């Protein structure tokens, strides 16, 4: 039977193989140029985020809801959640109805929410209805 790789195994396998190759590309809005983040840089940033999450008290198996637009930090942050041993609960920015966000956060038993400054208003609006949420983390 073939070995089953976890996402972490997959990332580490390809970081070892392609460490200096671009993994992510993001447009710098100041220069209007696309800038790469290598596999190695992505892994290092993800591990720093994982360390930060663990320092905040995130425990293995805890749920973290994640609301952000598509960008490098979304990928890196999700990897950080996995490296911390937590479970990522992705939330779509297309969820315009407060009830949809509340439902997903409450029913996932998320104790933390990671968001961008652009989505923060949505999160602030639902916090009173999500008593299990202990912390909101803003990536910006």
Model-derived features: positions:
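Structural motif
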Residues: 65, 112-114, 137
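A short N-terminal helical cap/helix-turn-helix that marks the beginning
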Residues: 2-25, 44
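Conserved ATP-dependent adenylate/AMP-binding module captured primarily in the ANL superfamily
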Residues: 95-126
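ANL superfamily adenylate-forming
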Residues: 28-31, 118-140
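Structured binding elements
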Residues: 85
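Short beta->alpha connector loops at strand-helix junctions that form conserved
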Residues: 91-93
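Conserved AMP-binding/adenylate-forming core of the ANL superfamily
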Residues: 24-71, 75-79, 96-102
